[in-house]
Regions:
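Short beta-strand and adjacent tight-turn residues that come in two discontinuous sequence segments
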Residues: 115
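Alpha-to-beta junction loops
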Residues: 107-112, 135-136
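Acidic donor-binding loop at a coil-to-helix junction in glycosyltransferase catalytic cores
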Residues: 120-121
Length: 212
């Protein structure tokens, strides 16, 4: 986006202490919007408290996502999972910035977000923003392995529980991208909610400009 002059990019910084993300900052210089979060103290946009949306039906929701930008990169799996979402009436947008998409989930502009092939610096700050805004984050299996696994699903609790069973059989960690989906149904919602709400991660920091 930045290279092509499209005004949708950001600076995304997260602080990780002892494997836990404790501080997050995402700055959009084009709109002068500063998203911040401190673990246990809420999420804010330009010092105003923000919350995830409360929409609970896919047909009323706006979802952010990211399509493969390299040829043949999981394209069959993406196309397979898009059909049930479209059939259920979900409206989707691809903005090109995973970090801003997560900030938009935190502020309720997007109701949910999902994408494959992400790096820790794409999602570290945004994951804390979402959880501090009352949302949930995880991988497509409903687990907390989103930093190392490259999968990110974020949204309000209701939509999260709806999207996991749709994404997991096609894009879950146990599915090989080039093979037919073969995993079982998603885990029980109770176990998902416990795992997703943690901002756990490996023992390393994450601070990078968002170039996704």
């Amino acid at each position: 986006n930045f290279i092509h002059g499209l005004p949708h990019y950001c600076i995304s910084i997260a602080l990780m202490e002892r494997g836990v993300i404790t501080q997050a900052l995402i700055f959009d210089p084009n709109r002068n919007e500063l998203f911040t979060a401190t673990r246990g103290r809420g999420a804010f946009l330009n010092d105003r408290r923000i919350r995830a949306s409360k929409r609970f039906r896919l047909e009323d929701s706006l979802l952010g996502t990211g399509f493969p930008f390299r040829r043949h990169q999981d394209e069959d799996a993406y196309l397979t999972v898009l059909r049930p979402l479209v059939d259920k009436g979900a409206i989707m947008r691809r903005s090109g910035s995973a970090a801003l998409d997560l900030a938009y989930v935190a502020t309720g502009r997007f109701d949910a977000f999902f994408e494959l092939g992400l790096k820790p610096w794409d999602v570290a700050a945004g994951s804390l923003l979402v959880t501090e805004a009352g949302g949930l984050v995880g991988d497509f299996d409903g687990e907390a392995n989103y930093l190392d696994g490259g999968q990110m699903l974020a949204g309000n609790p209701k939509l999260f529980s709806i999207l996991v069973p749709l994404l997991q059989p096609v894009l879950g960690s146990g599915v090989q991208p080039a093979a037919p989906a073969a995993t079982d149904a998603a885990p029980a919602p109770r176990r998902q909610l416990r795992a997703r709400s943690r901002a756990a991660a490996p023992e390393r920091g994450a601070a990078e400009d968002d170039r996704h």
